[in-house]
């Protein structure tokens, strides 16, 4: 298995969650601890693991794909129960609750964030930093008195922006500053549509030797969503060594907006060539060359 030199969500943690306030779960209702309830849900994910070459997800257990999972039960859009898991839990990916007979809305989430998302509102699931590769399921279920065991298929719920710096990073670069406009860390699981946009300025990311690829994730708020990304490398004395503006980057659900560009060539902004290329791990790649 090849491991690309990629700085993943350290940056996304700072960019995406900045202006959308993360609201902690209400303390009046704690998550379910039922082991053998009358609803048992097992999640499956048959998409190739993002960033891994020549290896199918079918061979990768969920606890190697994600670090956290949540199952949330709503009735008439009101949350009635939920379960949060971490990948060290026994039977990670299988969750159980005990419910009164009736019809419910089921949401299942899988991600690798540092905290479980806020799930109080059925139509607004909010993630804290960092936003990672998120998979989700939504559907209606009918629960009776007898045990009901179901399997659900998770689908990717985000878009990804991948920046590949094509020139050498000067030795005197100490950290990067990213300004990112037009992203979302909240979405409606019933539609997989992102809800709010965020902007964050002046976030300092320490340079990691050899890392020239950065991956950022966002929920997609609509077909016309455009993202502006400004990148600058600074010296230890906080002098700008090089900078680049990437305006109007389109993002689409389950697609990668891939940017191949120099950052330290002295050109602040340039034209883009855009093409869509099929990819095994995502629905497609929107390829930008600056």
Where are these regions (language model features)?
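Conserved "repeat-terminator" motif of extracellular CCP/Sushi domains
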Residues: 151-158, 216-222
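Bacterial N-terminal signal peptides that target proteins for export
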Residues: 1-8
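Short amphipathic, basic-aromatic surface patches that mediate peripheral association
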Residues: 24-28, 34-62, 165-169
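Surface-exposed interaction/gating patches
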Residues: 156-174, 183
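Tryptophan-paired
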Residues: 60-120, 172-253, 280-290
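C-terminal motif of bacterial Sec signal peptides marking the signal peptidase cleavage site
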Residues: 15-18
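Structured interaction patches on ligand/partner-binding surfaces of diverse proteins
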Residues: 22, 85-91, 113-149, 236-267
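Intrinsically disordered, low-complexity repeat and linker tracts
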Residues: 20-34, 262-290
């Amino acid at each position: 298995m090849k491991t690309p030199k990629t700085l993943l969500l350290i940056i996304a943690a700072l960019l995406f969650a900045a202006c959308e306030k993360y609201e902690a779960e209400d303390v009046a209702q704690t998550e379910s601890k039922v082991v053998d309830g009358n609803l048992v849900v097992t999640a499956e994910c048959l998409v190739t693991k993002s960033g891994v070459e020549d290896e199918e997800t079918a061979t990768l257990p969920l606890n190697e794909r994600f670090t956290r999972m949540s199952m949330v039960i709503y009735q008439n859009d009101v949350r009635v129960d939920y379960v949060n898991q971490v990948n060290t839990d026994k039977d990670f990916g299988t969750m159980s609750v005990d419910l009164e007979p009736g019809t419910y809305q089921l949401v299942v989430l899988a991600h690798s964030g540092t905290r479980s998302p806020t799930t109080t509102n059925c139509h607004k699931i909010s993630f804290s930093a960092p936003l990672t590769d998120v998979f989700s399921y939504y559907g209606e279920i009918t629960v009776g008195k007898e045990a009901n065991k179901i399997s659900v298929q998770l689908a990717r719920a985000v878009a990804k922006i991948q920046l590949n710096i094509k020139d050498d990073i000067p030795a005197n670069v100490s950290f990067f500053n990213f300004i990112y406009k037009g992203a979302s860390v909240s979405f409606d699981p019933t539609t997989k549509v992102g809800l709010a946009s965020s902007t964050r300025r002046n976030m300092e990311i320490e340079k990691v030797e050899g890392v020239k690829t950065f991956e950022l994730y966002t929920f997609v708020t609509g077909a016309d969503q455009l993202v502006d990304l400004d990148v600058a490398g600074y010296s230890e004395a906080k002098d700008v060594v090089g900078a680049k503006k990437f305006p109007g980057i389109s993002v689409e659900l389950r697609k990668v907006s891939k940017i191949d560009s120099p950052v330290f060539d002295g050109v602040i902004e340039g034209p883009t060539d855009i093409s869509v290329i099929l990819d095994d791990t995502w629905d497609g790649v929107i390829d930008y060359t600056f």
